[in-house]
Amino acid sequence: MDKFTQDIKDLEVTTVERARQAIANKENATFFIGRKTCPYCRKFATTLASFVAETQAHIFFINSEEPSELEELQAFRSEYGIPTVPGFLHIEN
């Protein structure tokens, strides 16, 4: 298992649709948007893994390289002002 995959193992892999549902349902949720080929995402994932290990926080992961998600993810990122990865979105209602 590569380092990035190891670092995100405690995150819940999810979709843009799930993120939109969380927003619509006014859930408290945190999303990390990234990809393993991004050096900044890999560095952030290492920091995030430590945070999750210490706090047991529940964080969702959206893979920005998932082919089936690309178009919807681009619209989502534009809508919520996430120009690049790594992206981080925390929703608290």
Model-derived regions: residue spans:
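Conserved short-loop catalytic and cofactor-binding motifs
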Residues: 7, 32, 36, 64, ...
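Residues that cap or flank secondary-structure elements
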Residues: 11, 39-40, 65-68
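N-terminal "domain-start" segment that seeds a small globular fold
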Residues: 1-19
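Thioredoxin-like thiol-disulfide oxidoreductase module
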Residues: 58-93
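Local sequence-structure signature of Cys/Sec-based thiol-disulfide redox active-site neighborhoods
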Residues: 16-58
